[in-house]
Amino acid sequence: MKLLLLALPVLVLLPQVIPAYSGEKKCWNRSGHCRKQCKDGEAVKDTCKNLRACCVPSNEDHRRVPMTSPTPLSDSTPGIIDDILTVRFTTDYFEVSSKKDMVEESEAGRGTETSLPNVHHSS
């Protein structure tokens, strides 16, 4: 008897807590629910049986969009944008030389204008 008294309130409150248990029917391509009043964030899209409203979440677009294939880029005709998007690569060349190479080149160009200094060793 105690078990029956505990189970009775649970069965009475269960439809109010769980919406699917109360038997709300799906509507509007199975994206909405038939309710007496729509909740916040839902919009009325249609009417269900027993004077209930078909409530659909208003933040989603439930229309079916036809699938289209993207247009390949090769079919498009060339235009100004193609000229703008064309990137030309340029490479700059640099010569790298050391100071030793520069001294040797400068001495070769001048010839032997300078003589070696005389070094005197005194003991």
From Swiss-Prot:
Post-translational modification: The three-dimensional structure formed by the three intramolecular disulfide bridges is indispensable for antimicrobial activity.
Segments of this protein annotated with the region Disordered: 100-123
GO terms assigned for molecular function: lipopolysaccharide binding
Keyword set includes Secreted: yes
Compartments, as annotated in UniProt: Secreted
UniProt keyword list: Antibiotic, Antimicrobial, Cleavage on pair of basic residues, Defensin, Disulfide bond, Secreted, Signal
Purpose of the protein: Host defense peptide that exhibits antimicrobial activity against both Gram-negative bacteria, such as E.coli and S.typhimurium, and Gram-positive bacteria, such as S.aureus and B.subtilis. Inhibits cell adhesion of E.coli on intestinal epithelial enterocytes. Causes rapid permeabilization of both the outer and inner membrane of E.coli, leading to morphological alterations on the bacterial surface. Binds to bacterial lipopolysaccharides (LPS) with high affinity, and may thereby be involved in immunoregulation through LPS neutralization.
Protein name from the UniProt record: Defensin beta 118
Native organism: Pan troglodytes (Chimpanzee)
Organism ancestry: Eukaryota, Metazoa, Chordata, Craniata, Vertebrata
